[in-house]
Regions:
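Vicinal oxygen chelate
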Residues: 1-6, 12, 78-117
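Core segments of cupin and vicinal oxygen chelate
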Residues: 1-7, 11-48
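Short linear motifs in intrinsically disordered
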Residues: 27-31, 67-69, 90-93
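Mid-chain, well-packed structural core segment of small domains
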Residues: 59-85
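Short alpha-helical
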Residues: 18-19, 74-75, 98
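Conserved short beta-strand elements that form part of the metal-binding/catalytic scaffold
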Residues: 28-63, 103-106, 110-116
Length: 117
């Protein structure tokens, strides 16, 4: 059986794609090239499904949630706050999995940040 090799991309609709790309670059350090190519560091990737009634993604109208691995969750959340980002007050610790925090991008999309255990 053929298998997928990994996530090949994540595509986001935006009223102002250039401004949203700049936010991801300036606030999260996602330095994609002019074609959108970004080379991520090696590490685990989670693929999970959720019940349709979940509130975990924030708004129920949001059908998927992007999760970025980070080295230091506290430092990333502080950096986002300094940049004026909409950062959730709470974080979550899951034993053996890691720590989680959330930011909402300028387009209103909730993004999860994960510091693996």
């Amino acid at each position: 059986m053929e298998r997928v090799l990994g996530i090949g991309g994540h595509f986001i609709r935006a009223a102002d794609p250039a401004a949203l790309s700049a936010w991801y670059r300036d606030c999260l350090g996602l330095d994609a090239d002019e074609n959108g190519l970004w080379r991520q560091e090696a590490g685990p990737t989670v693929f999970a499904t959720f019940e349709s009634e979940t509130d975990y993604f924030g708004s129920r109208s949001q059908q998927t949630m992007l999760n970025f691995r980070v080295r230091d969750l506290d430092a990333m959340l502080a950096q986002l706050r300094v940049n004026g980002a909409d950062v959730a007050d709470e974080t979550q610790d899951m034993e053996g999995v890691g720590r989680f925090g959330w930011v909402t991008d300028p387009a209103g999309t909730r993004v999860e940040l994960w510091q693996p255990a």
